[in-house]
């Protein structure tokens, strides 16, 4: 079962920040500078957390992963000023 996650991070080093930014594109949709919306099952969240752990400096950096619950039941109530907020919808993936 997929859950909807919001991932936010504060990375002190520009090189690590760029690396994490590129990595996160493989797991979700970019919302703002250091914020991603991700729709992940159990295996993908474990893979994402492992990838994050390899990049961050645990003494300097901070990553928050907010689990909003089962993706099919979550209807985020988001106020957006400026660019429209578009939640991730369930889509078929062709491999």
Swiss-Prot record:
Keyword Magnesium attributed: yes
EC id: 3.1.-.-
Keywords from the UniProt entry: Antiviral defense, Endonuclease, Hydrolase, Magnesium, Metal-binding, Nuclease
InterPro entries: CRISPR_associated_Cas2, Virulence_VapD/CRISPR_Cas2
Binding-site list for Mg(2+): 10
The UniProt record lists the keyword Zinc: no
GO terms for biological process, alphabetical: defense response to virus; maintenance of CRISPR repeat elements
Disulphides: none
Domain of life: Bacteria
Gene3D superfamilies noted in UniProt: 3.30.70.240
Record GO terms (molecular function): metal ion binding; RNA endonuclease activity
EC top class, as a word: hydrolase
Essential cofactor(s): Mg(2+)
Quaternary data: Homodimer, forms a heterotetramer with a Cas1 homodimer.
Family named by the database record: Belongs to the CRISPR-associated endoribonuclease Cas2 protein family.
Function: CRISPR (clustered regularly interspaced short palindromic repeat), is an adaptive immune system that provides protection against mobile genetic elements (viruses, transposable elements and conjugative plasmids). CRISPR clusters contain sequences complementary to antecedent mobile elements and target invading nucleic acids. CRISPR clusters are transcribed and processed into CRISPR RNA (crRNA). Functions as a ssRNA-specific endoribonuclease. Involved in the integration of spacer DNA into the CRISPR cassette.
Name the record gives this protein: CRISPR-associated endoribonuclease Cas2
Organism encoding this protein: Geobacter sulfurreducens (strain ATCC 51573 / DSM 12127 / PCA)
Lineage, broadest ranks: Bacteria, Pseudomonadati, Thermodesulfobacteriota, Desulfuromonadia, Geobacterales
């Amino acid at each position: 079962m997929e859950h909807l996650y919001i991932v936010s991070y504060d990375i002190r080093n520009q090189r690590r920040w760029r690396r994490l930014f590129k990595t996160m594109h493989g797991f979700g949709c970019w919302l703002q500078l250091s914020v991603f919306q991700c729709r992940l099952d159990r295996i993908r969240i474990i893979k994402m957390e492992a990838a994050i752990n390899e990049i961050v400096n645990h003494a300097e950096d901070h990553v928050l992963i907010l689990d909003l619950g089962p993706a099919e039941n979550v209807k985020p109530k988001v106020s957006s000023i400026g660019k429209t907020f578009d939640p991730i919808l369930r889509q078929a993936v062709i491999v």
